[in-house]
Amino acid sequence: MCRTLAAFPTTCLERAKEFKTRLGIFLHKSELGCDTGSTGKFEWGSKHSKENRNFSEDVLGWRESFDLLLSSKNGVAAFHAFLKTEFSEENLEFWLACEEFKKIRSATKLASRAHQIFEEFICSEAPKEVNIDHETHELTRMNLQTATATCFDAAQGKTRTLMEKDSYPRFLKSPAYRDLAAQASAASATLSSCSLDEPSHT
């Protein structure tokens, strides 16, 4: 059974609080709109040591692969915050919008949302125009004539590759993530130590 943080020694609580604060500072500017499948707020397990340990493992897992980062709500929020510092958050927001788009089952809603995404991210002088080649741009434009769940696949793939090869390595090397990963390692070790040191109750 998970032990509550309230039962941990003060030093353990302070370490967990410090880690949470550091992550909060790192993410506080990350605001993903509902149209992109909102995942902008980090989730900190404040009640159970197991949740906090899993959270630390989540942070450390972001450096294992880009897929793991994108599959983590906290990872997406952290990566989005980093991209905002580079003024390139539109790539991730477009990718997320495409992921949500694929879940639409109504043909009418699909067509309407397809045009919204195109106007926001693809068309010339779009407010959040992504950097894709002319061929992909034209292919996507043609796909909108008969919108399907896959009409943005080519453009989404291009932006994903760009993020994975360009932005993702810089994110991992950023002082913010390296410091966060160090804190995650320390927090994980501390929580493990506290769990072992906590007196048993009978």
Curated annotation (Swiss-Prot):
One of its GO terms (molecular function) is GTPase activity. Residues 65-181 form the RGS domain. Keywords: GTPase activation, Lipoprotein, Membrane, Palmitate, Phosphoprotein, Signal transduction inhibitor. InterPro entries: RGS, RGS_sf, RGS_subdom1/3, RGS_subdomain_2. Interacts with GNAI1 and GNAQ. Interacts with GNAI2, GNAI3 and GNAO1. PANTHER family: REGULATOR OF G PROTEIN SIGNALING, REGULATOR OF G-PROTEIN SIGNALING 16. This is Regulator of G-protein signaling 16. It comes from Homo sapiens.
